């Protein structure tokens, strides 16, 4: 109880400095009481695209300013039942679109790991990662579409876990791209991530993409008896764009793992080279469809100051979207138009399937969804970097993105492939390099095996 109250006491000052929360639960301290529940008195931050009855849900967008949901998301209900105390709704890139945490109606989130200068916290779950890094929550929920939990975790030197697609309910999560969106968990250590995941890992009949119980039973059989891991190092995710200093630190970690008996193998997933292209064909197309509902009638609000008498009815509402969201709506609608649908969208779907099949071919476990046969000589996990470099300053990131939005899209190059395949991934801090993460990836549904491996990697870095 004392620790929870201390975190909540520090919250206003941290929020003022780093712009972490869009709204704060003013009664949180009164909710701290003796508890023996699984997450009793653990303080949590909820990303502002996960609906809550008692706090506004805005997606950091002017379109949803002040919106109050009539219900709680399933994950919020589960956390409440487990005894967690909600501190507030965390800042984010508008509707989850961005990798820097700067595209917010409420202003950019700053990185508590770099207090000496204004530095980006990563996106889109910027506020969730910043809340963990600032020490004002024990853990936070984010959403990961193409790296939105893992990238901020790397930039803030915290842990960010994206479960397998379908393991955690999306009911009550405001969609960006529904075939990719996954609720993720951020914390300081893997052990706490595991505790939270155990609470959230269950079938939800309200979510049509929730993994059914029969597949969860198959997933429970994915257990390793051996102590040492076979670790694959994907050649496509360790290229020349990575700074020499980061490569050197990564090699130190690999040497330590090998010294402890883990086996390292070079592997190749050639389809990774198409991942960014595929992602930006599919995700904006889904976003364009999802955001069409914000018409000022069912959802959203109208800008009464605009004289749009000669324009379309919904223009005053659509005008409240930020620049990045507008860019992706335009791109998504183009990819869905008659001329581009066959050449862009459908080809991207085929390339996505090819990527999934190639990932399946290098893992020792089978993919319980695709039915692809396991590779007896395959690896247990993949190890790569989460990002190419430490986080840039706010000024540098903004300047680079202003020159071309494509510059920021490249930040997702190491995280997007796993999202397209629906694989479980986790980013843990790289020892000796503040603001850089190691990314571990396992076969679909092997989430607990992945968490075991992540604990091993973190422990070996301490030795």
Swiss-Prot record:
The keyword Mitochondrion applies. GO terms for biological process: endoplasmic reticulum organization; glutaminyl-tRNAGln biosynthesis via transamidation; mitochondrial translation. The keyword Protein biosynthesis applies. It is an enzyme of class 6 (ligase). It comes from the Eukaryota. It catalyses: L-glutamyl-tRNA(Gln) + L-glutamine + ATP + H2O = L-glutaminyl-tRNA(Gln) + L-glutamate + ADP + phosphate + H(+). Gene3D superfamilies: Amidase signature (AS) domain (3.90.1300.10). Its EC number is 6.3.5.7. Keywords: ATP-binding, Ligase, Mitochondrion, Nucleotide-binding, Protein biosynthesis. Its main location: mitochondrion. The active site is at residues 47, 124, 148. One of its GO terms (molecular function) is ATP binding. It is found in: Mitochondrion. GO terms for cellular component: glutamyl-tRNA(Gln) amidotransferase complex; mitochondrion. HAMAP family: GatA (MF_00120). Belongs to the amidase family. GatA subfamily. Subunit of the heterotrimeric GatFAB amidotransferase (AdT) complex, composed of A, B and F subunits. Allows the formation of correctly charged Gln-tRNA(Gln) through the transamidation of misacylated Glu-tRNA(Gln) in the mitochondria. The reaction takes place in the presence of glutamine and ATP through an activated gamma-phospho-Glu-tRNA(Gln). This is Glutamyl-tRNA(Gln) amidotransferase subunit A, mitochondrial.
């Amino acid at each position: 109880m004392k620790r929870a109250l201390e975190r909540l006491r520090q919250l206003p000052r941290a929020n003022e400095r780093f712009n972490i929360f869009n709204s704060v639960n003013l009664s949180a301290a009164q909710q701290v009481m003796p508890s023996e529940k699984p997450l009793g008195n653990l303080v949590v931050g909820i990303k502002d695209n996960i609906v809550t009855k008692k706090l506004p849900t805005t997606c950091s967008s002017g379109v949803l300013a002040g919106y109050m949901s009539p219900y709680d998301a399933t994950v919020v209900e589960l956390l409440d039942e487990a005894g967690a105390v909600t501190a507030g709704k965390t800042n984010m890139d508008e509707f989850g679109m961005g990798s820097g945490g700067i595209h917010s109606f409420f202003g950019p989130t700053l990185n508590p790991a770099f207090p000496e200068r204004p530095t980006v916290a990563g996106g889109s779950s910027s506020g969730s990662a910043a809340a963990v890094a600032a020490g004002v929550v024990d853990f936070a929920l984010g959403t990961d579409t193409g790296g939105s939990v893992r990238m901020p975790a790397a930039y803030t030197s915290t842990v960010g876990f994206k479960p397998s697609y379908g393991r955690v309910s999306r009911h009550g999560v405001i969609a960006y791209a529904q075939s990719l969106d996954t609720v993720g968990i951020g914390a300081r250590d893997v052990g706490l991530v595991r505790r939270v995941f155990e609470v959230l890992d269950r079938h939800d009949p309200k979510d049509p993409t929730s993994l059914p119980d029969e597949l969860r039973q198959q997933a429970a059989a994915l257990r390793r008896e051996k102590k040492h891991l076979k670790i694959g190092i994907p050649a496509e995710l360790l290229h020349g764009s990575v700074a020499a200093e980061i490569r050197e630190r990564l090699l130190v970690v690999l040497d330590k793992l090998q010294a402890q008996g883990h086996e390292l193998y070079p592997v190749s997933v050639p389809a990774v080279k198409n991942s960014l292209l595929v992602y930006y064909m599919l995700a904006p197309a889904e976003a364009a469809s999802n955001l069409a509902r914000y018409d000022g009638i069912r959802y959203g609000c109208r800008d009464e100051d605009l004289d749009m008498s000669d324009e379309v009815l919904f223009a005053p509402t659509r005008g409240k979207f930020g620049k990045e969201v507008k860019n992706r709506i335009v791109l998504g609608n183009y990819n869905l138009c008659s001329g581009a649908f066959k050449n862009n969208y459908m080809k991207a779907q085929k390339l996505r399937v090819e990527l999934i099949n190639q990932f399946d071919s290098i893992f020792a476990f089978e993919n319980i969804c695709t039915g692809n046969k396991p590779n007896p000589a395959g690896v247990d996990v993949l190890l790569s970097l989460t990002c190419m470099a430490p986080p840039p300053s706010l000024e540098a990131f903004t300047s680079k993105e202003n020159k071309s939005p494509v510059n920021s899209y490249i930040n997702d190059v190491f995280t997007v492939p796993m999202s397209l395949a629906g694989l479980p991934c986790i980013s843990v801090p790289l020892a000796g390099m503040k603001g850089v993460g190691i990314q571990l990836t396992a076969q679909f549904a092997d989430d607990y095996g992945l968490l075991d491996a992540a604990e091993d990697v973190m422990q070996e870095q301490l030795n």
